[in-house]
Each structure stands twice: as C-alpha cells, then as structure tokens.
C-alpha cells in the first residue's frame, strides 16, 4: 500500500518513461506511421535520459518520505515473450498523444512542484515540461497539476502528507 495519492502518482512508470521518450522520438513519431514506442523508441540514449529522470524522481520521493519503486527496469526485459504486447502498442503518433499531453500536465508537472518541499532538484523534468509546453502551445507548468492546484504551494513535505491523509490543513 502507498501512503497517499501523490506517492502512487510518482510511482507510475509513465511519469519517467512516456514524456521523455516521446520527446526524444518526436521526429520518428511524426514521420513513421508504424512507430511503436516500446519497440522503436527505447535506444541507449533514451535510456540515459530515463535514468536521469529516475534519479530526480528518487530524490523527490525520498524527500517526501515516500517509498520509491524504479520504473525503467522492466523496459530492459521487453524482449521477453510475456511482454510482447508492450512492443506492439501503437504510437504515440504525434504531439496531441496522451504520452505528451497527460504526462506533461499531470505526473511530471506534479513531480516538479514537489521538488521544493522535498528539497530535491528536477531540472530534467522541468525541461521536459517546458519542451512539451512549447510544442503543444500550452503552459503545462501553469495549467498543469501542481501543489498550487491543490492549495498546497509553500507547504512542507509533512504538511502536504498530513493533508493528503487527513483532508485537513493545519496552520
């Protein structure tokens, strides 16, 4: 079990994988009608960026007092027959795909806003949100889910966790 909804959100593998890999594969996505994210898009260079995202996620989760679960390990075994479904999933097909829109808006943006109370740094995640914002002409940092969205901006990690567990903000 997880402590709260933020811990569950941060432990989603999508947060680490979707936005980063999609941005690095944008030209392939737009030019290849047969592009498959998990078959075609996970190159050694992409894995390096995913590992950097893992480090940022781990720092934020540790600072928030959450249990950290690595996201990218299963990707190294995608050639296993039991994971064939992942390799054949379509797309993403372009900028409006949920791997770019939802993950910039929700998971990755939330992680960047948790960096301050967690005393962590998220320059890679912030850069990904900035790139997705420019490409989709949407300011995900302002419009996306963040501590500000939930009225928790400026709160400490313990105050945030308290609120998520009790529904009460203590002054």
Which functions belong to the PLM regions below?
Residues 1-2, 65-72, 122-125:
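Short, surface-exposed acidic
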Residues 25-30, 55, 59, 106-113, ...:
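Generic structural signal for well-ordered, non-membrane alpha-helices
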Residues 41-53, 70-71, 96-103:
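Alpha-helix N-cap/loop-to-helix boundary motif
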